[in-house]
């Protein structure tokens, strides 16, 4: 295990920059916002922890990358930011996301509300779910795990063709596992930053995926015909638990963060850290560090305390929308509270940040 501790000077420079104009820009921020972000380089800061590497298989150890400070983010000429003509985050479900239509709709509402709070100030719109066959993507049964997988490159091409004119980006989400090419076992997701499109799967976030109890394996191994999408009829969808919801929110916001121009964070424990495996992804916090928070604020223009309060409200609102759901049939109407148990510690952390902002 290794703890990555940067010096106060390094973190301060990464946050403020050496560019006098960017330093001046920082000094014009609200006093509370400066106070919170300055926690990044305070010796006894207890809000933003250093990064801890647990093994050589962790992302930073196995994927060396140059770090991105605020100045590099701000001056990146290839970075795309939302503008009045392209300001909406579109999310395209591929197939159903819940084991009934109503549960799928509730889950979509929860994700939409979370994204709107996290990217406070941007609009988030969910498009009507499309079937796998509508994308005309290639697919396969994984030879090792015997679960269904769809081809990321073909999904990205479908999303690019169907990207609305006012979209800042469009991201596809699915409960079906993904693969980028025949030689790969799987991939959690893939994005094209230049095109503003991405596709991400939550299939491996179910509680049983990595156990012998996993129910999503195709029972009888079979050769798939590229045009026969009937294999996806009644495909397995994991239960929407609090942990699965948390993992989904993490992945969605991390990847949209990339589309906004944020690279993998190497400064402090942060949502924007890379992850090589599910265990490492679970260790990542839901929050962004002060350096990435400044990047996000610069791209979107939100008030930080209002953003944090919106996130607390999302956690406290037990249900988004009036409809309920049932695990038995989509016609039965049962109240479905939002499963936010896994978010409770983060809620307390946000309240501590709000206290610093409003001091």
Curated annotation (Swiss-Prot):
| Record-level GO BP terms | proteolysis
Q: Where does Zn(2+) 2 bind?
A: 265, 270, 289, 292
**What EC number(s) does this enzyme carry?**
3.4.-.-
**Which residues are annotated as active site?**
255
Protease: present as a keyword of the record? Answer: yes
Binding-site residues for Zn(2+) 1, renumbered to this chain: 254, 258, 264
Protein name in UniProt = Archaemetzincin-2
Organism of origin is Rattus norvegicus
Q: What is the lineage of its organism?
A: Eukaryota, Metazoa, Chordata, Craniata, Vertebrata
Gene name per UniProt: Amz2
